[in-house]
Amino acid sequence: MKKKNQKLQDIIGIACGVLLLVIMAVCIISSNTTKTVGDTNVSAEAQTLTGTAQGRNGPVEVEVVADAERIYQISVLNHEETEGLGTVAVEKLPPAIYENQSLAVDAIAGATITSEAIKEAVIAALESGGLDPSVFQNEVAAAAPVDKTDVELECDVVVVGAGGAGLTASVFATQQGQQVILLEKMPFVGGNSLRAEGGMNAADTKVEAELGITDSTVDNFVEDTLRLGHNRADPALVRTMAENSAEAVDWLFSIDAPLTKVVATGGTQHKYLHKPENGEPVGEYLVEKLKVQAEQLGIDVRVNTKATEILMEDGQAVGVKAEDDEHNYIIHAKSVVLTTGGFGANFELMASYDPSLANAVTTNHSGATGDGIAMAQAVGADTVDMDQIQLHPTVIQQDGTLVSESVRSHGAVIVNTEGKRFVNDLAGRDVVSQAELKQPDGYCFIIFDQHLYDEVELTHKFVERGFTITGETYEELAQNMGLQGDAVQNFVDTMNTWNESVAKYKADGTPDAEWGRDNGMDDDLSTAPFYAIKIAPGIHHTMGGIKINSNAEVIDTAGNVIPGLFAAGETTGGIHGGNRVGGNAVCDFIVFGRIAGKSAATFADNVALPNAA
C-alpha cells in the first residue's frame, strides 16, 4: 500500500511539474508577444506574412496581414528586447505604422535599434509575399499643434529623471513617508542605467565577508577610486560613496535585488564588483527591481514628461515646470531632486570640450543630453569636471553596444590585428582606450572561450546578435578574425602564453609576465569553441556635472548650498575625477540616490509647500 501511495505521489509530482513548465512556457511566450493591431475586416487578397530582423538583443519576428495597397494588421510575434526600453518600441511602433499606413514613422526615442528592426521585419514580411514595401513609405504628416492645458500639481518631493538614481531617490524618499512625483522625458524609465552591464562596486559588505574577501575595505576602495581618477575627484564625495556602499547593498537585498557574486573590475587592486547571481546585466536587473518598488509604493511616475525649469522662491527650489504632449505643468514641491543623467549623447556639448568627440560612437541612450545640468546652471548651480569625458575601450562600433568589464573580469583578453596583447587588459578604462587608439587598423578584438560564455550570461546576446566570430581552435579563430601571415601564429602563441600565465597566477599569485595583469585570472581561456568580438573605444561616461556635497545638496557658484535642491547620479560631478572605475556608476547612483532621497525627505519634513496658505 505504501508503495502504491508513493507511486501515486510521484505521478502527481511529475504532473504538477509538467503543468508548471507549461504555465512558465506560456508566460514566457506571452511576455514576448504583442496584441494584434489593425482591422478585423480584411480584403480577399490579403495575405498573412511573417518577417524577421535583428533587434538590439536578438531577432524580432512580426506577423503582417496585408495586400498590395493596405496593411490590415501587425503584431510582434517574438522578441528579446530589453523590458522598459525596447519593449516600448514593440508596444508603440506597430500601431503607428498601421495608423499611418507607413513605415516612415519616427523611431521611438531611446529605442532606435528596436524600432528599425520592427520596420525591417515588416519589410521582410511584405517582400516574402511579393508585395512592394515602397507603397508604404509615404511621408507621415506632422502632428497638428495641440492647445496644451495648464495643470498645477503638489507633492513633497519632485524627482526629475527616472534612471537608476531617480528611481532610487524616489523609492527612498517615499520610504521616508514623502509623496513623490517622478518625471521622465523619455517614453520609458531606466535611462542609461539600463545599459549598465557589469555590477556595483562596494566595500566591507556582508557578501564579501561570506566569500572570504577581507581586503576590499573602505580605505582601499577610496584609494583605488582616487588613484584611477587621477586624483581629480573630491575625496569627501568618494569617501561618502565608499562608506555608504555596504549599507546600500544591504538595502538592495531588502528590496529583493540581491547582488551575490563579487569579482574584480578594471584597474582596481581588490574585488569590489557585486553582481547578480546569474550574471545578468546589472542595470536591467536593478531597474526592474526599482520599478517594482515604485509601483508597490504608489509613486506617481510620469514618462514622456520633460522638466524645463526649476522654480525658485527667495533663493530656494520650490518645484519645477514641465510639459508633455497635452499639458504644461507647474509642480509645487517642498524639495527638488535632479537625476537627469549625463550628456554622453549631446555631441555639440561634448565637442565644445573635446572637438575629437564630434563624430565618435557613444554607448549612451539618446536622452543623455545634460538637461538637468543646464536647468541647475540656470538657477546658479556650479559645475565641476565638465571636460572629463570617458572613453570605454570595448565598444562595438556598429551601434555603440558595450562589452562590459565584467567579461574581462572573468578572464577575457584583448588582442590587436597582429595577434598580440598590448596592454594590461584590466587597467583603467582610459589606459586601455588610449593603448587601443595606438594600435594598427584602429580596432582590436576581445577574446573569450566557451567556459566564460557559460559563466557570464551577458555574453549570450553578443552571439545572438551576430557580433561574435568563432573558431574551434585558436588558429581557426585567428583566420576567421581576418588575421594575416605571422599574426595567426602570434595569436596562437599569445593565447598559449596567457593560459600559462593564468596557471602561474593560480599557483602562487604571480602576475601576468607580459603586461602585469593580476586580476580576473581565475580561469584560463582553453575551452573550445573560442569567441572574438571586434571592438574599439567609444564615449561612455561624462564625469562632470552639477557640484554637490556629501548630502547631495547642490552647491552654487559662490560655494553655498541652494536650499531645497538636490542631485545624484551622472548629472553630478566630482565623484569620478578624470576616469570612472567600472562599477562605480552603479555604486554612485544607488548610494547618492539614497542620500538625495533622504536629504530631500528631511528638508521636506521641515518646510511647508511654498504655495500653501
Residue ranges of each PLM-predicted region?
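Helical element adjacent to the flavin cofactor pocket in flavoenzyme catalytic cores
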Residues: 278-334, 373, 377-379
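Core beta-strand elements of the Rossmann-like FAD/NAD(P) dinucleotide-binding domain
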Residues: 152-155, 325-335, 561-562
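A glycine-rich dinucleotide-binding beta-alpha-beta segment and adjacent secondary-structure elements
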Residues: 309, 490-579
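An anion/pyrophosphate-binding glycine-rich loop and adjacent beta-alpha core
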Residues: 373-375, 381-486
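Active-site- and interface-proximal helix/loop "cap" or "latch" segments in soluble metabolic
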Residues: 37-141
